[in-house]
């Protein structure tokens, strides 16, 4: 599981966090999973680095298989989120990142997270995530499944607006497309 005592010096711990573990209804947030991760890391004298995700290939269903991290309420009408299956990396289903309800859920969660956690000393930094496989902002080799640029921009702007103190980290290849 990657959790344990290590003799190698370290001060940070990393975790993925499913969006559906945070967003439990429209505008309704549950912070217990993130609070637990933060408390555990702080209890070991460390800070947490984390990334939210929606699509984690070959992951997370009880007993194995795939389970989406799209919040459950977005799977029902009106305008339910639809999915495109893929077989790479063990398989999964990319959500329709252009679905406005999904975009609103992502940006709302980021804003709420910023209101609650910006400046929290238990957080080393937050990885910009949510979009693409593992929240890594790519769907290679299925590039057509990646979020439209309007969704990418909405997520960027949400992180930028929500976090003034806590550092938000992006990979250089994510930045390349915006320069």
Give residue ranges: language-model regions:
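Short, surface-exposed basic-aromatic patches at helix termini and helix-loop junctions that form
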Residues: 35-43, 118, 159-163
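Well-ordered, non-membrane alpha-helical segments in soluble/globular domains
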Residues: 27-37, 103-112, 145-158
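N-terminal substrate-binding region of glycoside hydrolase catalytic domains
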Residues: 1-102
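Aromatic-lined carbohydrate-recognition surfaces of secreted/lumenal glycan-active proteins
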Residues: 122-134, 153-178
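Active-site groove signature of glycoside hydrolases
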Residues: 77-103, 107-145
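Solvent-exposed N-terminal domain segments of exported/luminal and surface proteins
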Residues: 1, 178-179
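Short, well-ordered coil/turn segments that N-cap beta-strands
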Residues: 9-11, 44-48, 119-124, 164-168
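Conserved, mostly hydrophobic/aromatic
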Residues: 13, 41, 113, 126, ...
